[in-house]
Amino acid sequence: MSFAALEKTIDAAWEARDGINLQTKGEVRDAVEAALDALDSGSLRVAAKGDDGKWVVNQWLKKAVLLSFRLSDNKVMGDGPGTTWFDKVPTKFEGWDDSRFRAAGFRAVPGAVVRRSAYIAPGVVLMPSFVNLGAHVGSGTMVDTWATVGSCAQIGKNVHISGGAGIGGVLEPLQAGPVIIEDNCFIGARAEVAEGVIVETGAVLSMGVYIGASTKIVDRETGEIFMGRVPAYSVVVSGTMPGKPFPDGTPGPGLYCAVIVKRVDERTRSKVGINELLRD
């Protein structure tokens, strides 16, 4: 079945989703399985950059991921000693052997969990972390310890997602577009990016920065305010904006914001650059 035919079948199934269940067979089940396989292999992705440089979201692939929950039952699963789960989504590595891992070309250390339909490119290093279904992780990226990559999130090439950082998903609460981290970005420890925010090429988020769709991102030099995207090559830290005064005129509470303190320079890049030795 061509990708165009898959899209047509899944869009139609989505409109009739109340009638889809564990007993559903035939074209709908085959289309959903084919879509998940294409996401898993990287031949399709939930969002991709168009020729104009703008990101285009393939909503039908999100629908395929969601429909898979109606088509699948919970079952006992486990990939290693002492690991047993009960879920509808198998792990990506279920049944893999040495040759399969070598062909895939990435490293997954003990404790790394990746669900089926997430794509992991060659050269990626997965520390004990979690990558949810439908996500796409580009080559040379490091997902550090206890970091999470949410459902359908798009992570570019040579990105570093530091320990405990969180990249939000799209499935619950349902979001129109996935979080996108473009190439060569650095996401600091315990930082969070959610609600479809786009972090553009080469940006650096400091430790503990939280950015959602409504977070104000203030350029300290110009006063310009961005929302929903972090401009390319920005260095971003946590900050506050003055709040409205109380009725009696006393200062009100300040509100959280993110602050662009500068643009990435060689000094910054030397601190956040990837270590090629870890990717051999």
From Swiss-Prot:
Chain segments annotated as transmembrane: none
Subcellular location: Cytoplasm
GO biological process: diaminopimelate biosynthetic process; lysine biosynthetic process via diaminopimelate
EC number of the protein: 2.3.1.117
GO cellular component terms, semicolon-separated: cytoplasm
Top-level division of the source organism's lineage: Bacteria
This protein's record includes keyword Heme: no
Residues binding substrate, per UniProt: R107, D144
Gene Ontology molecular function, alphabetical: 2,3,4,5-tetrahydropyridine-2,6-dicarboxylate N-succinyltransferase activity
Leader sequence residues: none
Alphabetized UniProt keyword annotations: Acyltransferase, Amino-acid biosynthesis, Cytoplasm, Diaminopimelate biosynthesis, Lysine biosynthesis, Repeat, Transferase
Similarity comment: Belongs to the transferase hexapeptide repeat family.
PANTHER family: 2,3,4,5-TETRAHYDROPYRIDINE-2,6-DICARBOXYLATE N-ACETYLTRANSFERASE, ACETYLTRANSFERASE
Subunit structure: Homotrimer.
Annotated protein name in UniProt: 2,3,4,5-tetrahydropyridine-2,6-dicarboxylate N-succinyltransferase
Organism placement in taxonomy: Bacteria, Pseudomonadati, Pseudomonadota, Alphaproteobacteria, Rhodospirillales
